[in-house]
Amino acid sequence: TQADKLFEGIDLSLLGDDLQPDRLVTAEDLARDGLAFPAFYGDDMLLPIGKTPAYLGQAVAILIYHDFARFRFAKDKLKFREGTIKYGAQTGPLQRDPWGTFRYVRVGGDKPFDDDRFSSLKDTPIFPISMKKHLPVWPEGREGGKLDQEGMYYAGMIADELKTPPDEWLVMSRRYTTQSVDTSALEPDNANGWFDAETQTLHLVVPTQSPQEVADEMPRMLAKRNPPVKQLILHPCYTVGYGSKDHFNFPYYGAVAAMYGDGHPVRLANDRFEQFQTALKRHAFDMNYRIAVNRQTGVLQSFHGEMTADGGGRSNFTPSVVMVAATAAQSIYYFPKSDLSAVGLASRAIDAGSARGYGTLQSMAATEMMVDELAAELKIDPIEFRLRNVLKSGMKNTQGAIPAGAIRADEVLEKAAKHEMWLQRAKRKAEFESQHPGKRYGVGFGCVQKDFGTGAETSFARVELGEDGRIMLHHSGAEMGTGMSTSQSVLCAQWLGKPADEAHFSVTDWSVLPMVTSGDPYVMSQADQDRLQTNPAWTPSYCSPSSASNSAYYFSHSTREAARLIFDHGLWPAAMAIWQSGPGGGQAAPLVVRREDARWVEGGLTAAGMEVLSLERLAKQLYQMGGIAGAAVHVFNRWQWAEADFTLSGNSERLPIDGLAVRNAGGEFKTLPRNQVYYPPTQRNNAAVTYYSAVGTLAEVAVDIATGQVELLNHHSIMECGNLIVPELVSGQLQGGLAMGIGHALHEYLPLYEDGPGNGTWNFNRYHLPRASDVAVWKQTDDILPALSETDPPKGMAEVVMIPVVAALVNAIADATGHRFRDLPVRAENIREVLQ
């Protein structure tokens, strides 16, 4: 569909009589039968006649066939045919207000550790008071006024200072743009469904990163049908999406197709052309940055950033993507003053949503390119310049929040500065260029730290120990190729001595622990939270999708806490009962045996020199004693964990969970009401991020001055991500993220509008995904900082790994050619234009 004319219907005469669909579903059918998208996805699941499409390629009808052969022939006949859709009057594209707008202003104290004069966490983020010509109108700045007015007063102060800076300041202004890309998940969107009209039951198999969202929203959608669907039997399955299958609308199209399948099972599945045409895209960004630095000290002073992202024609996660982009733009640096705003525009492009990197890829890569240019202007080594300005533990981010734990980006920088690729770069450049006439050699560096989590992270986990010592795990998280099904199983070993024997993921039935939610965890008032939390089953958010690099830290928390409860209230009492059995208190009596001395060793559990007890023996004892053999927990994190008091074994315990059910040996699960709950204050939403993991990447390139072709000779990454649960999975994430970052920097590109994927003609014949030959597959190396201790939590790192290589490559090209590119991707034709 074109997005500048009225839609007037479809013409299927090209199919003749033999290839007409057995069922044609249009917007009129959906309206008659009461079927519509959940509110999150907006209006017009299928476009009604007489309306202008909201975006290029918007769906207008579903054609259903009872046999595959006719379907295949019909599909081939219609593909790439423009006459099938009929248009009316020219209207121009729809003009709409932005999908989301955010602004974060901070003015720190005289020193980094002093109290802020103004910040989002201490005071408030700033939101527009209205829209004018579809652009935000900000509050009037006023010292001592309302919080948002005071914020704008400080924003004005920052702008004035950058306009007329002190003599010792260097102020640099640059514009950066990044492209729209397809996440290129190699499983296209699909759904298998069957509607049993006799029982009014819909069976649906869908690959999704957010099974709980489908399980929650789809029954509501189907309940409004005329007549209502009585039951949904949902089968979420493993998938791969890189974000594109998180809160995506395809499952709802699959459900609708099944509803009109005339009793037949229906498969709705994109081919690769259709996947390019309809799948969620990464947001294209346009960024204007202004950064001030003290010329004498080389210390950053102020950062003003304005970003716009193209959110496409249907709002998805655009508001949170632009929010995350703004709050991440500082990268690894401390800025005493900052004013960062981001706007997510509505356009006629394909809808953009969650994609690996989630706005930070765009904003942080730009910061890293600019920092390199500032270092060159000041004639300071780029890594030394970074070290002078790196955010250190206890310093505040641009929202005024202190990040969690030790910030170790400085260690990453110090390690990179000592790497031979960096130390030998001048010598290698001279040698390479003398041996390869016609090629230019360059080395570049980038280092970022990215948040993991969303500020409303929730999950369920249920762990059970059988009398035979078998461990069973149920988890709400979805496996999407990251290996979380392996890592969550492995985590059980910390408390139970071995990985889970049986594990289930994308679990949507949590009747063993009934929790309820209401309100929006991001915008609710403190008064509302205080009122709602008096219900012991209430939680601010029910269940998170697999997204935001959340499995290693957040999903692991629920798994570990469930396993810990079985150890504390089942296995440890069982172990003590065995060790203390016999005359005079048994083998334990002569020694001091504490729970904190417990260790799993080969063969079982020991503590303070006690006999090693196998898990099977412990389980048998636990079941004889009737201890806790199963625990189901719900957890919530708003940049810190919710805690609650529960009565266990007659004692009150405060646990970092907000819901709990336990199963005693031989019994059924029983929900334990919490006595008191301690949710993080709603003001903590303004922190926007507190958890970080850091990665630095060195890249070595050769540029052919005749063709502009960039050859990636080698790259080395240094990562800090706490304790590794499964090192092989971390390595896989690092290598895969690097490949995606290389593609973003050098190869992948989609036009946004009429020439882009919305026209249905895009496939991998036109879209260059990086291959092994593009990523230095046999030469790349990595270095992972050891954890500070065995108690360090694992950190989410699946997104951060793809970001620094983008800046490293662009900085390396600048080192090779002498020209700084600011628009991504940097392709051969862009380099040829400059060199010739």
What are these regions (language model features)?
Residues 107-222, 390-468, 683, 697, ...:
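Helix-loop-helix junctions that connect adjacent transmembrane helices in secondary transporters/permeases
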Residues 233, 238-269, 277, 484-492:
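Thiamine diphosphate
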Residues 288-296, 300-303, 463, 698-717:
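Active-site and channel-lining beta-strand-loop segments
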Residues 8, 34-39, 74-77, 188, ...:
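Short acidic, glycine/serine/threonine-rich loops at helix termini
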Residues 1-124:
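Flexible, low-hydrophobicity surface segments
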Residues 59, 66-67, 263-311, 555-584, ...:
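Phosphate/diphosphate-binding loops
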Residues 201-206, 470-475, 712-714:
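Short, aliphatic-rich beta-strand segments
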Residues 27-30, 224-229, 259-266, 322-438, ...:
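C-terminal catalytic domains of large/alpha subunits in multi-subunit enzymes
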